[in-house]
């Protein structure tokens, strides 16, 4: 199956790399210079210029959201599948792109490593549903939300939380350095714990995981009490809410 990615930014590149092992990926951009890095990685590239035919193609919209109107004037024909990663662009806004099936999704840059968590929503006509899931699950875990209004919050959890967790990882590694570890060793331990904890959380409720690690009067519960004292729970919950509120403005 051929997939045409319209855009050449960080997300377009991440998806192209994540998809290349299973699909034939063609990256479409404004100029050869902007596509040079992807071309050097072996991807086929095309220029859309003042007009570009999307007839019967499977396309992924990965350009800047503000460019949607201008791109709609350039694109000709009717796409087969149109998958959009454009922030704050719902199905109604995307109707300016002619396609048989439209899907909105919010992957994150971990798509490059096939580790993205991608919430998505598509028109409920059943058409091409399996193919859309196959495409999105190629670069990680694809999660279909029940209705389109849930995409804003789901997008925050998948797209913004990596930044929140990066702060956590950096803080934990700094704590290790404060206690005497070399920076590289501390960072490696933290990244490893993130990976192993993620696997545990797939089959275990967070509270049960925490309780399984905390021994009475032990070292872990001492640290947990310190986190609770500083309002760690409300800080993270508030961060999600603030990002959500910003996304729907």
Residue ranges and their predicted role:
Residues 1-50, 54, 58, 115-116, ...:
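NAD(P)+-binding Rossmann beta1-loop-alpha1 motif at the extreme N-terminus of oxidoreductases
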Residues 13, 17-21, 40, 73, ...:
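Short, well-ordered alpha-helices that flank and scaffold nucleotide-derived cofactor binding pockets
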Residues 51-53, 58-124:
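Glycine/small-residue-rich loop that forms an oxyanion/phosphate-binding "nest" at active or ligand-binding sites
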């Amino acid at each position: 199956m051929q997939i045409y990615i319209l855009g050449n930014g960080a997300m377009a590149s991440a998806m192209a790399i994540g998809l290349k092992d299973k699909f034939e990926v063609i990256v479409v951009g404004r100029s050869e210079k902007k596509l040079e890095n992807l071309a050097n990685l072996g991807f086929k590239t095309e220029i859309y210029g003042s007009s570009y035919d999307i007839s019967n193609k499977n396309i992924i919209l990965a350009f800047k959201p503000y460019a949607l109107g201008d791109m709609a004037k350039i694109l000709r024909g009717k796409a087969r599948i149109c998958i959009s990663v454009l922030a704050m662009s719902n199905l109604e806004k995307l109707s300016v792109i002619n396609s048989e099936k439209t899907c909105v999704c919010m992957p994150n840059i971990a798509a490059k490593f096939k580790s993205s968590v991608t919430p998505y929503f598509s028109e409920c006509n059943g058409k091409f549903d399996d193919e859309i899931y196959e495409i999105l699950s190629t670069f990680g875990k694809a999660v279909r939300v029940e209705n389109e209004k849930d995409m804003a919050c789901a997008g925050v959890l998948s797209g913004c939380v990596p930044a929140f967790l990066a702060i956590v990882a950096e803080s934990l590694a700094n704590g290790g350095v404060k206690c005497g570890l070399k920076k590289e060793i501390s960072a490696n331990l933290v990244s490893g714990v993130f990976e192993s904890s993620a696997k545990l959380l797939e089959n275990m409720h967070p509270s049960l995981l925490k309780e399984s690690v905390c021994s009475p009067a032990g070292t872990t519960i001492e640290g947990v009490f310190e986190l609770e004292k500083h309002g760690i729970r409300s800080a993270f919950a508030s961060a999600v809410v603030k990002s959500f509120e910003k996304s729907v403005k």
